[in-house]
Amino acid sequence: MLTDLFVIVIYFLAIFCIGIYAGRRQNSLTDYALGNRSLPWWAILASILAAEISAATFLGAPGEGYHTRNFTYAQLCIGTILGRIIVGRLFLKPYYDYKVVSIYEYLEKRFGLLTRRTASMVFLISRVLASGTRLYFAGILLVIAYQFLTGVTADASQIVLLYIAALVAISVATTIYTAIGGLKAVVWTDVLQAVVLGVSMLSALWVLFSHIPGGWSSISAAMNGGDDWKFFSWGTGEGLDFLQQGARVLGQEYTVWAAFLGATFITMATHGTDQDMVQRMLAAKNSKAGTRAVIVSGLLDFPIVIIFLFTGILLYVFYQYNPANLPADTPQLHVFPYFIIHELPNGIRGLLIAGLLATAMGSLSTALNSLATTATKDWYQGIFKPEATERQLLRCVRWGTAVFSLLLILVGSITAWYVVHHPEVRIIQIALGIFGYTYGSLLGIFLCCCTPHRSSAVSVVLTFNTSLNARASFPQSPFAALLISFDAVRMFSIGCYRLHSLSTASAVLTFNASLSARAPSA
């Protein structure tokens, strides 16, 4: 285990050195938040990939491969590529033209201050909840490792304390280099984290394959189900009428339709209207470099997802030949971390742990930087101190990083407590679903910006509120991904019209009230 600890210590030392080195010569908020718009596109590309692959993906995608034993999840990459092409061609140039630091400044220039404040607040709340929930995943491997090393079978309260300790350790380390170095530290540490992630996953694949007796012949023999190895699914069935076919298609998560409709709109929202992801694209020298980074990242998503899913498939085959090595009650999400701790040799195990830490810290640093930047630009400078000096802005954004870190630790700890006491909960759906309530409406607002028509701030905000209420009225819908696209289209269609009369505004408010009454209570 000393070799593993050595690998992890070297990783942390490298991260801190990069973060401190990157934090030199920062004289303005633009330097801190956008790296003075001077970062190379390939570094931004690596940073996008590192931010996308959270701890939830690192553990959840192999879990999907283990459970489904096919590659249908990967077809969603069709939509992610299309969505990024649209983002690069439609959104990035206006952001550069207006020289925004917070993308919600762009909404103010198009629709007024009220729209900017509304979108900014929605982002802050939803990002704290979503990133805090995802932070929980980073603690899973560390908790399993502690139990493996000590041989202690902890009770529920002890497990929660272990999670909290793990989340605090990861968050404090990430907060230090993020607060000191700003976006430059985030991007350049992400480059290292992307390399560590890639090497660790390829190492896991090599070990898995070498531990399966018989190699490919054994893998083929174990994978003999009707849906095994499948790449594409239309979601249709035999002997069903048109309506039944439609219901069946909409009720499935991974289909070609979900790829073209759901994944495309979701990617447009995540990479075009979310400060968390757009901020690094704005650090490129110009919009063309930012566009190149985001589109190439979409192309690389496909092989990355294939590697994660294939890892899960090999995990299934490995435990088919070694059933005694895996406890029968092991949750799907814990299969990969259990393999890492119990099966990998020294050194490679440390590399995989470093890989998980890389995914967690990459996503966390991105969230902290974007939250602090948005709060500083939209609220501290925008409302409380418009005349703030650059030194005051830098102090605010650094303290904001620490404050948001505490909030994310709090949300992550609550999530850990809830999952430990309710193990049947699918926390990945909760983490992803938080943004499902807001992404479609936010995307609709930004799409309205792409038209020559200038809606009033009141019409945009009222329509945005209506869309949120409509989405909240159907929280258990199985068509969550498609609802995001419907939300965006509805928001775009209605938001392009002005509310000229009191009667029209009254009608929208009445519709809001009826939807609020329809929404189930918590």
Spell out what each predicted region is.
Residues M1-T30, V101-Y104, E108-V143, A165-D228, ...:
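Membrane-interface loop-to-helix entry segments
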Residues R110-R117, V128, V160-A165, T376-H422:
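Loop-to-transmembrane helix boundary motifs in multi-pass membrane proteins
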Residues D31-N36, G63-E64, R89-D97, Y104-R110, ...:
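Helix-loop junctions at the membrane interface of multi-pass solute transporters
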Residues F71-A179, D241, Q245, G262-T270, ...:
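Helix-loop-helix module between adjacent transmembrane segments
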Residues P40-I48, L82-G83, V87, L113-S126, ...:
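Select transmembrane alpha-helical segments in multipass membrane proteins
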Residues S28-L45, Y163, L183-A185, I430-V461, ...:
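C-terminal membrane-solvent junction of multi-pass transporters and transport-like membrane proteins
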Residues L2-G23, G35, L39, A43, ...:
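Extracellular loop-to-transmembrane helix junctions
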Residues L34-L39, A43, G60-Q75, E108, ...:
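Loop-to-helix junctions at membrane interfaces in multi-pass transport proteins
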